[in-house]
Amino acid sequence: MAFLDNLKEVPQNSGSGGGKYMKLQQGSNLFRILGSFEDGTNIQGMLGWAEDEEGNRKPFRWEVDQEAPRKFKENPRQFYALLVWNYADEAIQIYEMTQAKLRQDLLTLAKDEDWGDPRKYDLKIVRNGEGLETSYAMTPSPHKKLAAEIIEAFKDTKVDMSALYRGEDPFAESAQEEEATEEDPF
């Protein structure tokens, strides 16, 4: 179960508009997970929001088993940072999944023997409502081979997801070279 191998348990009391990050839009959002927690192209951690030295609201991320870098007014939330293909934007992006229900839905699918590794099928998340009235529903699409041009784009994309823990850009020129693997997860 390589997709789940490096996920860590989080204590229960822990708290798109294009570009490099996928933002869920109202209605249907279709994407394919490309990365893996095993090779670091997907990561999990904790996310808290606070003001930086200039007074700007800024995200602070750290690994699940690490100490929070500071105190936060609001409880930090667990997140998965997933490298995905966003079909609407036709681009590789990072989708930061913070909603507990969506994380649980993803884990349920990944553990299900009929669905398994979510890199082998597309996912659709339907977003309805605004603010505290927002609801989400995740639905898997039937298994299908990923298009060759998406696989090529993935191979050509250099990303260092651990940069998120340092408050840096994972797509920056200094991103680490990823080691090629023989396994085709798609």
Predicted regions: what they are:
Residues 1-115, 156-186:
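OB-fold ssDNA-binding interfaces and closely related basic DNA-contact patches used
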Residues 79-81, 122, 135:
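Beta-strand-rich binding-surface signature
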Residues 114-131:
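Elongated alpha-helical scaffolds
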Residues 119-121, 149-151, 162-165:
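Glycine-rich loops and low-complexity Gly/Arg-rich segments
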Residues 128-156:
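OB-fold/S1-family single-stranded nucleic acid-binding modules
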